[in-house]
C-alpha cells in the first residue's frame, strides 16, 4: 500500500562516498535534503582498500575540500598513517595518501550527517523513481510503500544495483561486504529510458594480523611530517601505524596457473568489464607471464582490529585456491583468512547520457554520481557526489549550474572524460589524464576553487577567511622576495658555491635566484635573514610559484587558448542534420552526446578537426542570421 510520507528539495539515493558529499553539499546550500541508505551502518563505508588519496586521487580530495566538502576533514580526523607520494618527482604529481581507520571513518561521517542542518538520514530502500507529465522527477517510492516528493534526485548507488558476488564457482546476489543488494531500482531506470550496463570490481581477502610474519617484510612507516588533506586541519601530529611491503613467489604463480581454469575471470563466469588499473592477482599472472614476482602491501584496517588488507592480491578464485595462493606470499606462509576475496558485478550507466552538470539528459532533475557513472574509487565517487549535490541544489534554487572546466580542476577532467568520451571500463583518475598538471597541483586547490565554492554558498565564512589569510600570506611573501635583491658579495658567492651554484655577476632578486635548478626558497634562507615566520604550506607555495613561474605562465597561456573554444557555446536546440559537411560519424556522435561547447565537441571520439571547422562555420552563419 503506497502512502505519502514527506516533501524534500533533494533526495540522495545511497550513502557511500558520492552520496555523503552530495547530501552534505545540498543541505549546506540550504536545501531540505533526504539521504536514503539501505543500511545506516554502511555510511561512508570502505568496502575495498582502507585508504584515501594516492596518485591523482589525493588531488581530488584536496579539490573536494577546497569546495567545502567533507572527505578531507574526515580522513584527517581518522587516519592512522599519512604519506606524501612521488616526492622525488615534480610538485605537479605529489600526491597525499592516508591509511584510514575504516570503522572510525564511517562512524565519524555518519555523525557529521546526523548533525547536519537541513539533512534527514533514513534507512530505506528506494525501488522506483517517479516523473511527472513533463518528464521531470517528482518523487521516489520505497520498498515499504512510502512516497517521498522531491524536486531533484541524486543517484549514488555504488556497486549495489543488482550486485552479484562471485567466488570461484560460487555466486550469489549481494552488495559489497555482505550488505544487501538493490535489485529493484535498475528496472525503474530502464523504464525511464536509461541505458544500463554491467561492470565488475574485486577485493582481496582480509587476513588475521596474528598469523602474519612481519619480520620477513619491509616496514613502511608514515611520514614524520604529517600534511593534512583539508586546508582547515591543523596540528595533526599523532602516533602512526606501519604498512608492510612483501612479494609473491614462484609458487604463487604456480598455484594460480594450475587453477586458472577455476578462475571465473578466465572460464567465462564473469562477463562484465573490470578496472584496468586495479587487476586481480590472477589477471596479473596471466598478463605478465615473465614477471617473477609482484608487490604486495599489507595494510591495517584500523587500530582496534586484527584485520589486514592484502593490497595487490585482489581475487575471485575459489576459496581453497585463495588460501593456498596467499600462503605462498612471503610472510603469509601461515596466514588465516578473516574474509574471503571476491569479485562483484553491478549495474551502472553509460555516462554519455549525462550533462557536464551530471544531470541525465533524458530525465530533468535526475543526477548521477560515483560508480553508477562508470568510475572506480572512493575519491572519484566523492568528486562527482559534490558536483551532483551542488547542481541539484542550484537547480532547486533556479540558479545557473556549476561546471568545472578541465583547466579548473582534476574534478573537471574526470567529469569531462566521463560525459564526453564515455568509458568502457571502470574509470580511474590519473595525473596523465590532465593537460594542465602544473597548474592543477594538490597544494593550490584552495587557490583555484575556494572562491568558487564561496560564491555558490557551500564554503563557510570561516573557511573563506582562512583561505584569504593564506592567499594574502603567499602574495605578500612573493612581493617581498621580488623586491629583495642579493648582491654579488664575497660571502654570497662562497655560500652559492657551497650549494653547487655559480657565482653572481650582478644583483638579482631572491625570486629570480630561486629559479636556478640547484636552489630553492628553503636553501636560500641564509641570504634572507629577515624572512618572516610563515606556515610551511605557505613557504612551499611561494617556492613552487617562484621556481616554476616560466612553466606555469606557459600553461596559463595554453588555458587561455583552451577557453576560447570552451566559451563558444552550442545551443541546446541545434539541428545537426541541418549542417552540411559533417561526416556521418560526427553527426551521430554529436547528436548522442549533445556537447555544450565547441571545446567539448572537439574532445568527442570520432569528431575530427574538420568537423569542428564545419560546426564553427555553421554557428557563425546562424549567429549572423540571428536564428539561434
Curated annotation (Swiss-Prot):
Superkingdom assignment: Bacteria
Compartments, record wording: Cytoplasm
Binding sites annotated in the UniProt record for FAD: 14-19
Functional description taken from the UniProt entry: NAD-binding protein involved in the addition of a carboxymethylaminomethyl (cmnm) group at the wobble position (U34) of certain tRNAs, forming tRNA-cmnm(5)s(2)U34.
Entry protein name: tRNA uridine 5-carboxymethylaminomethyl modification enzyme MnmG
GO biological process: tRNA methylation; tRNA wobble uridine modification
Subunit composition and interactions: Homodimer. Heterotetramer of two MnmE and two MnmG subunits.
PANTHER family: GLUCOSE INHIBITED DIVISION PROTEIN A (PTHR11806), PROTEIN MTO1 HOMOLOG, MITOCHONDRIAL (PTHR11806:SF0)
Residues that coordinate or bind NAD(+): 274-288
Cell inner membrane listed as a keyword: no
UniProt keywords, alphabetically: Cytoplasm, FAD, Flavoprotein, NAD, tRNA processing
One GO molecular-function entry: flavin adenine dinucleotide binding
Cofactor needs: FAD
InterPro entries the UniProt entry points to: FAD/NAD-bd_sf, GIDA_C_N, MnmG, MnmG-rel, MnmG-rel_CS, MnmG_C, MnmG_C_subdom, MnmG_C_subdom_sf
Family per record: Belongs to the MnmG family.
Organismal lineage: Bacteria, Bacillati, Bacillota, Clostridia, Eubacteriales
Keyword Flavoprotein: yes
GO cellular component terms listed in the entry, alphabetical order: cytosol
Amino acid at each position: 500500500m503506497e502512502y505519502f510520507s514527506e516533501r524534500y528539495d533533494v533526495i540522495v539515493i545511497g550513502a557511500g562516498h558520492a552520496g555523503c558529499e552530495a547530501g552534505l553539499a545540498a543541505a549546506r546550500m540550504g536545501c531540505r535534503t533526504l539521504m536514503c541508505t539501505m543500511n545506516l551502518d554502511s555510511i561512508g563505508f570502505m568496502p575495498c582498500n582502507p585508504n584515501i588519496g594516492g596518485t591523482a586521487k589525493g588531488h581530488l580530495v584536496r579539490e573536494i575540500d577546497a569546495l567545502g566538502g567533507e572527505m578531507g576533514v574526515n580522513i584527517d580526523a581518522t587516519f592512522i598513517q599519512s604519506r606524501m607520494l612521488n616526492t622525488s618527482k615534480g610538485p605537479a604529481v605529489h600526491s597525499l595518501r592516508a591509511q584510514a581507520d575504516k570503522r572510525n571513518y564511517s562512524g565519524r561521517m555518519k555523525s557529521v550527517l546526523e548533525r547536519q542542518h537541513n539533512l534527514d538520514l533514513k534507512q530505506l530502500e528506494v525501488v522506483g523513481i517517479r516523473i511527472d507529465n513533463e518528464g521531470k522527477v517528482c518523487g521516489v517510492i520505497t520498498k515499504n510503500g512510502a512516497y517521498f516528493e522531491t524536486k531533484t534526485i541524486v543517484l549514488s548507488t555504488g556497486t549495489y544495483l543488482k550486485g552479484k558476488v562471485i567466488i570461484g564457482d560460487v555466486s550469489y546476489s549481494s552488495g559489497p561486504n555482505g550488505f544487501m543488494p538493490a535489485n529493484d531500482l535498475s528496472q525503474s531506470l530502464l523504464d525511464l529510458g536509461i541505458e544500463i550496463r554491467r561492470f565488475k570490481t574485486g577485493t582481496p581477502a582480509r587476513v588475521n594480523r596474528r598469523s602474519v610474519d612481519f619480520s620477513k617484510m619491509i616496514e613502511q612507516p608514515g611520514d614524520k611530517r604529517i600534511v593534512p588533506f583539508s586546508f582547515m586541519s591543523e596540528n595533526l601530529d599523532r602516533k602512526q601505524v606501519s604498512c608492510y611491503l612483501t612479494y609473491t613467489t614462484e609458487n604463487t604463480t604456480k598455484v594460480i596457473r594450475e587453477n586458472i581454469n577455476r578462475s571465473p575471470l578466465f572460464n567465462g563466469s564473469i562477463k562484465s568489464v573490470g578496472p584496468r588499473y586495479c587487476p586481480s592477482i590472477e589477471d596479473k599472472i596471466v598478463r605478465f607471464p615473465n614477471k617473477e614476482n609482484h608487490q604486495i602491501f599489507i595494510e591495517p584496517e584500523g587500530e582496534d582490529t586484527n584485520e589486514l588488507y592484502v593490497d595487490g592480491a585482489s581475487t575471485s578464485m575459489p576459496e581453497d585456491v585463495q588460501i593456498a595462493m596467499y600462503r605462498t606470499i612471503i610472510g603469509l606462509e601461515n596466514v588465516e583468512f578473516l574474509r574471503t576475496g571476491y569479485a562483484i558485478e553491478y549495474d551502472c550507466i553509460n555516462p554519455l547520457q549525462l550533462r557536464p552538470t551530471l544531470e541525465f539528459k533524458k530525465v530533468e532533475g535526475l543526477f548521477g554520481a560515483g560508480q553508477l557513472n562508470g568510475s572506480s574509487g572512493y575519491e572519484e565517487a566523492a568528486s562527482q557526489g559534490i558536483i551532483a549535490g551542488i547542481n541539484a541544489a542550484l537547480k532547486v534554487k533556479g540558479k545557473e549550474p556549476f561546471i568545472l572546466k578541465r583547466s579548473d580542476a582534476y574534478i573537471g577532467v574526470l567529469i569531462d572524460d566521463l560525459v564526453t568520451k564515455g568509458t568502457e571500463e571502470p574509470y580511474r583518475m590519473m595525473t596523465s589524464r590532465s593537460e594542465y598538471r602544473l597548474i592543477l597541483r594538490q597544494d593550490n586547490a584552495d587557490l583555484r576553487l575556494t572562491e568558487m565554492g564561496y560564491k555558490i554558498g557551500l564554503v563557510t565564512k570561516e573557511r573563506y577567511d582562512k583561505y584569504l589569510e593564506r592567499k594574502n600570506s603567499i602574495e605578500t611573501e612573493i612581493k617581498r622576495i621580488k623586491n629583495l635583491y642579493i648582491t654579488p658579495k664575497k660571502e654570497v658567492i662562497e655560500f652559492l658555491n657551497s650549494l653547487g651554484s655559480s657565482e653572481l655577476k650582478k644583483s638579482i632578486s631572491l625570486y629570480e635566484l630561486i629559479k636556478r635548478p640547484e636552489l630553492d626558497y628553503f636553501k636560500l634562507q641564509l641570504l634572507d635573514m629577515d624572512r618572516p615566520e610563515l606556515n610551511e604550506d605557505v613557504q612551499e607555495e611561494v617556492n613552487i610559484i617562484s621556481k616554476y613561474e616560466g612553466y606555469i605562465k606557459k600553461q596559463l597561456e595554453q588555458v587561455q587558448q583552451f577557453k576560447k573554444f570552451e566559451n563558444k557555446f552550442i545551443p541546446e536546440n541545434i539541428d545537426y542534420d541541418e549542417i552540411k559537411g559533417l561526416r556521418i560519424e560526427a553527426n551521430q556522435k554529436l547528436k548522442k552526446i549533445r556537447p555544450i561547447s565547441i571545446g567539448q565537441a572537439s574532445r568527442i571520439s570520432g569528431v575530427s578537426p574538420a568537423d569542428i571547422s564545419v560546426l564553427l562555420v555553421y554557428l557563425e552563419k546562424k549567429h549572423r542570421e540571428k536564428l539561434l
